[in-house]
Each structure stands twice: as structure tokens, then as C-alpha cells.
């Protein structure tokens, strides 16, 4: 059976893993890294993903997209989206359906479409490692993602050519990874997941049942717009204000300056986790009538901690609620597991330790644990692993609007999923012919203060006094946390139902169009790679041909030199065009001219008493003399790593 891979689709970085035997393998990407920046760039008709996109961000700020996960499944008018608009160099726009989309090169793109590019990169990374096509995946989402955000994530997978077998909550995935690696008996753990864009906390019970492990989520809470990006933004805001005081220039109006600030803030934040101060030095950050301006600001760890103290404090309240919902106190928690890159910040670790009264565990990789857990769940679904039972919960209450605009819960938050629950309602007026069912998700008592997931109508209700008709409303939530709602008139048996597709989101037609667009891009990418390979082979052959003629000297006749030079010129001209077949034909023509010359020279050298290492195959072009792609050699960036262990 084909492997089901596990993908952590992160705000800042993404990661892919797969179970091999009884071990999970975190798969390195083409650059040799175990995580891939969740950054996509559109440049010269090409789509760049990951490190290549990150490298060119400063010179292409308006077309380089990051932290797109913060927009997925969200409305443009959301307060959190509006806050981000002024802090990112790219353009966030309002789609026709009211969702938050982005605009690149005058083209409107849905967050699902952009996220699909990251998922395609993860898919390709897994395929290159496994040597087989991958079509199925388990993808992680923040535990506090609502129905619209979960559906949007599934849509992104579909656009990327993946059958998403399960959507799994990130803290739950981390607990799966922890449970597999640390078999320490029954215990209750808190997973504190502070990632690039979202925060979750889950209280999870790990139990050993006759050799099998049961991972049961007792409660979950969080904030889907709180993460490392907000920590970066707090520092960016400070730098912008300081520069404004000094130079009277607002850098927020300059996309290029904003992108440079973004990179510098992220770098400084990371440095301040291991040092007490750092200098942010950005020469020529902008210019005005008086000339170029340089930004040089020293930032201490204490200053950064002051800027983000309220953000760290915001993570503690969900921890209190999660414990209360689970009916536990901090003394009941055996282990605290930190997940997400932002959890490396010393202030975060200090506050978590103060709240839970114990030091968080440092033996779980915060960048990889979620992908590892997703891979374990993938193996469970494929039948490769059968000693784990996962019981997850729905993070938010699901209900309908009833008289007076009240939210009447049908499925309470922290209910184990999958789940199905029903409740009987009636009409509010005499002879009412139809009822409108409006489905909401959230914890507010007033229905309209929650997230509207969808609505539908049950009609043809027979005339009757108010309160007499019996309307049974059923909620059915699957293991992905995605909801189906039905309403049935018990007297007539008439039923109406909907698979909740939020009043926003992508239509099936839009998803299909995006899949076709992705497939078209894949074909373009294939053609581009084929053209690049043909050009590389041609260049290698041209170089070796010129070297051969020079090295062989008078062993080559004038006619042969002329023939080689002519063929070289024709091949050089062909490489400047975009016709792969012409390049291949001219390459073969040059090989056919060169081969007899080098073969003859080789034989003459042999007869003369040794070829001195001369090999005619070295001049065949193509891959000859080149490092094979499967030799495992990659281009890499080198960074000096200073050893802090004294």
C-alpha cells in the first residue's frame, strides 16, 4: 500500500515526514534542510518556494508571500487581517466572496492556492526520497482552527494533488510523536504550541492499554492569530517608530524597507534567545531629498521582552481555560511539551514554567514533532501501524441560532470526535411554513458574535400552532472536525441537510480551476527543467569540445577543427533559444563529430605507450564529467555557527 505522508503546514516553516518500519523519517528537502520556509515568490513567470523564495525576498517584496496561513479561511474584514495589512509588503485584498486574498502581478490569488504551492513542494520532497508517487497525506492545523479554516486547508491539499486523508490538530500530533518516543506509562501532558502564526494549548492523556497507546485529548484552547509573526511585528513597530523619531521618515510606506525590516527583526529575535543584545544595522534603508538614510539600532533582550510581554501573557489565559475544561490542576500535569519555533524564546519558557510549576521538556524537537505525529497518524490510517488509538476533540462549540438571537449549543467544545448529536426544536409562530437553520461556531452567547458557518431552510411544514411541529436538528462532525448538519420534520419525514461550506471559502468550480492551473504550472515547470538540463548538457559539451581540440593540437586536422567549431557555434546559438529538441539535435551532432576524433587520438596514444589518463568518454558531453543529481550533492548556503557551550 502507498505511504501516507505527514505534513506540518506551518506559518513560518513546513515539514514532511513518513513512517519507515517502526521509525519516523523527517525528510530533507532538495536543499538538504529538514524544514522548508513557508514562503512563495512569483518572479519572471516562475514560482519559487522555500529557501529560493526567501533569498530573493528583499529585491521582490511585493511578490514574495509569507505567513499566508494567517489568512486561510478568513474574511477580509476580520480585525486580525486588517491589522496585518499595514505590516506586510504584499497586497491583501477583498475577494468577491468577502475572503482575504492576495494580489500578485495584477492576479488575485486565494490563500488555499498559495498554500498548495508549499504542499506541492512537500509532496515532491517526499516523492524524491521514497522514489514513488505520493497521493495521500495527513495535514496538521492549529487545534483552534474553525470549520472554514479546516475546509480551506483540505482545499489547499486538493489543489496540490493530494487526497487529504485526515486533518489533525498540531498539539495532538506533537503528543503522538512524544508518546511514540517516550513510552513512560500513563500520564497527562500539556502541549504548549506557539508557532509562527498561531497558538494552541491541549491537555492530553496518554494511556497504555494492553501494550497499545491511547492518546486522548481532554481539552484544547488557543488563539489563531497569535504567534512568532506577532513577535516580529512588535519589534518591527518599535524599529519603525525609532527611525521615525530620528529621521522623520515612515518606513511603513516603503515595501522594500519593510521586507528588510522583517528579515532583520526575525534574525534579531532569534539572536536574542542566546545573547543579551544585538545590533540591527540596515544601511541605505531608504532615502529622501537630503540623501540616503541608514538604520542602526541596538536592541537588548530586556527591550524585546518588554515589547512582547503582553503577547506572552496572552498565551497563559488559554492554558488556564484548557486546564479548567479538562477538570485538572497544574499538579495533575506530568509533562509540559513545547512545540513551535517561538517557544524557544527564554521569556516564553520562563512564563510556561512559572504557570505549570515544572520545567518544560527539552527533548522534543519543536520544529519537527508535529510532522512526526502527522506521519504516525498517516501510518495508522494506512494500516502500517495499529498500536495507537487517537481520540481528538472539537475545539469550539457548534450550535444554531434560536429565538432572541441566542446560540443554542448542539455539540459542546472539547467533545470527542467523530460525534453525532441531535436536538428537537419547534416553530416560533402559528402556521409557520419553514424554518431557517443558521449554524454557528464559537463560545459567545449571542449567535451573531460567533463564526457563521452556513445556513439552510427546511420548508413545507404543515400548518400547526407554534410549538407543535417537531424539527429534529442533527450535527455530524467527522474526524477532520468538518461538519454536516441536517434538519428533519418528524411529522412528515421531510429532511434537508448541508455539508457545511462556510459562507466564504472556495466553490468546487474554483477549486477545479485552481487544480488545472496547478497542473498547467507543473507542466511548465517540467518543460523549464528539461530545457535547463538540455542547456547544461550543451554547455558541458561545448566546454569539453573546445578543450579537446586545444589539448589534441596537431592530432586534429584543419577540416575537423572547422567542423567542430561550426557545430559548437550552432549549438551555442541553439542554447539561446527555447527549443529543447533543437538543442538536443545540435548536441548530438557535435558529439558525432567529436567522438571519432577523440577515439582516434585515444588509440594513437595507446599505441605510443600509454594514454596518460586520457579518456574519450570525457568529451561526450551530456552528463559526462558532471556530478550526477543522485550523487546527493546539493548547493548549500553556509552559515558560521558559533559554539555557545563553554
Swiss-Prot record:
Pfam families: HSP70. Residues 603-646 are annotated as: Disordered. GO terms for molecular function: ATP binding; ATP-dependent protein folding chaperone; unfolded protein binding. Gene3D superfamilies: 1.20.1270.10, 3.30.420.40, Actin, Chain A, domain 4, Substrate Binding Domain Of DNAk, Chain A, domain 1. Keywords: ATP-binding, Chaperone, Nucleotide-binding, Phosphoprotein, Stress response. InterPro entries: ATPase_NBD, Chaperone_DnaK, Heat_shock_70_CS, HSP70_C_sf, HSP70_peptide-bd_sf, Hsp_70_fam. Induction: By stress conditions e.g. heat shock. The keyword Nucleotide-binding applies. The modification Phosphothreonine is found at residue 198. Residues 618-627 have a biased composition (Low complexity). HAMAP family: DnaK (MF_00332). Belongs to the heat shock protein 70 family. NCBIfam families: PRK00290.1, prok_dnaK. Acts as a chaperone. This is Chaperone protein DnaK. It comes from Acinetobacter baumannii (strain AYE).
Amino acid at each position: 500500500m502507498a505511504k501516507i505522508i505527514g505534513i506540518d503546514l506551518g506559518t513560518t516553516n513546513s515539514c514532511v515526514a513518513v513512517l519507515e518500519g517502526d521509525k519516523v523519517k523527517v525528510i530533507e528537502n532538495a536543499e538538504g534542510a529538514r524544514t522548508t520556509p513557508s514562503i512563495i515568490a512569483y518572479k519572471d513567470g516562475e514560482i519559487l518556494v522555500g529557501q529560493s523564495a526567501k533569498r530573493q525576498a528583499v529585491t521582490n517584496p511585493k511578490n514574495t508571500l509569507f505567513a499566508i496561513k494567517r489568512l486561510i479561511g478568513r474574511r477580509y474584514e476580520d480585525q486580525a487581517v486588517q491589522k496585518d495589512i499595514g505590516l506586510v509588503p504584499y497586497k491583501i485584498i477583498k475577494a468577491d466572496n468577502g475572503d482575504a486574498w492576495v494580489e500578485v502581478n495584477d492576479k488575485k490569488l486565494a490563500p488555499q492556492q498559495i498554500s498548495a504551492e508549499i504542499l506541492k513542494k512537500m509532496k515532491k520532497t517526499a516523492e524524491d526520497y521514497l522514489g514513488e508517487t505520493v497521493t495521500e497525506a495527513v495535514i496538521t492545523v492549529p487545534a483552534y482552527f474553525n470549520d472554514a479554516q479546516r475546509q480551506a486547508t483540505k482545499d489547499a491539499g486538493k489543489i496540490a494533488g493530494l487526497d487529504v486523508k485526515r486533518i489533525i490538530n498540531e498539539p495532538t500530533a506533537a503528543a503522538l510523536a512524544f508518546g511514540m518516543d517516550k513510552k513512560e506509562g500513563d500520564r497527562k501532558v500539556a502541549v504548549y504550541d506557539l508557532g509562527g502564526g498561531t497558538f494552541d494549548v491541549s491537555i492530553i492523556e496518554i494511556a497504555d492499554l494492553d501494550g497499545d497507546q491511547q492518546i486522548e485529548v481532554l481539552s484544547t484552547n488557543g488563539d489563531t492569530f497569535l504567534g512568532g509573526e506577532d513577535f516580529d511585528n512588535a519589534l518591527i513597530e518599535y524599529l519603525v517608530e525609532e527611525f521615525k523619531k530620528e529621521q522623520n521618515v515612515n518606513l511603513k510606506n516603503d515595501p522594500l524597507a519593510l521586507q528588510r525590516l522583517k528579515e532583520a527583526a526575525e534574525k534579531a529575535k532569534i539572536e536574542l534567545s542566546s545573547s543579551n543584545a544585538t545590533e540591527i544595522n540596515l544601511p541605505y534603508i531608504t532615502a529622501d531629498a537630503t540623501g540616503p538614510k541608514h538604520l542602526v539600532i541596538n536592541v537588548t533582550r530586556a527591550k524585546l521582552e518588554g515589547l512582547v510581554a503582553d503577547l506572552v501573557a496572552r498565551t497563559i489565559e488559554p492554558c488556564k481555560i484548557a486546564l479548567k475544561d479538562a477538570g485538572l490542576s497544574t499538579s495533575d500535569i506530568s509533562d509540559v511539551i513545547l512545540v513551535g519555533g517561538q517557544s524557544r524564546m527564554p521569556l516564553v519558557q520562563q512564563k510556561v514554567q512559572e504557570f505549570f510549576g515544572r520545567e518544560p521538556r527539552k527533548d522534543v524537537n519543536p520544529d519537527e514533532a508535529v510532522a512526526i505525529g502527522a506521519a504516525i497518524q498517516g501510518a495508522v490510517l494506512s494500516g502500517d501501524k495499529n498500536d495507537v488509538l487517537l481520540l481528538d476533540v472539537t475545539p469550539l462549540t457548534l450550535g444554531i441560532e434560536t429565538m432572541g438571537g441566542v446560540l443554542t449549543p448542539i455539540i459542546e467544545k472539547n467533545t470527542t470526535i467523530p460525534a453525532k448529536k441531535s436536538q428537537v426544536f419547534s416553530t416560533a409562530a402559528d402556521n409557520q411554513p419553514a424554518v431557517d437553520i443558521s449554524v454557528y461556531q464559537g463560545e459567545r452567547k449571542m449567535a451573531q458574535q460567533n463564526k457563521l458557518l452556513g445556513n439552510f431552510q427546511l420548508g413545507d411544514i404543515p400548518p400547526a400552532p407554534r410549538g407543535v411541529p417537531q424539527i429534529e436538528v442533527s450535527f455530524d462532525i467527522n474526524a477532520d472536525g468538518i461538519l454536516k448538519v441536517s434538519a428533519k420534520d418528524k411529522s412528515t419525514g421531510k429532511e434537508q441537510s448541508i455539508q457545511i461550506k462556510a459562507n466564504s471559502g472556495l466553490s468546487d468550480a474554483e477549486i477545479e480551476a485552481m487544480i488545472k492551473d496547478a497542473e498547467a504550472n507543473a507542466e511548465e515547470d517540467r518543460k523549464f527543467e528539461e530545457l535547463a538540463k538540455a542547456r547544461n548538457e550543451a554547455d558541458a559539451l561545448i566546454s569539453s569540445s573546445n578543450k579537446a581540440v586545444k589539448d589534441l593540437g596537431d592530432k586534429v586536422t584543419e577540416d575537423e577543427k572547422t567542423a567542430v567549431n561550426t557545430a559548437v557555434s550552432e549549438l551555442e546559438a541553439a542554447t539561446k533559444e527555447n527549443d529543447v529538441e533543437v538543442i538536443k539535435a545540435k548536441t548530438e551532432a557535435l558529439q558525432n563529430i567529436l567522438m571519432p576524433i577523440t577515439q582516434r587520438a585515444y588509440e594513437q596514444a595507446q599505441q605510443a605507450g600509454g594514454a596518460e589518463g586520457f579518456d574519450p568518454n570525457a568529451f561526450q558531453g551530456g552528463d559526462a564529467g558532471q556530478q550526477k543529481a543522485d550523487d546527493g550533492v546539493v548547493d548549500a548556503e553556509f552559515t558560521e555557527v558559533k559554539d555557545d557551550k563553554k
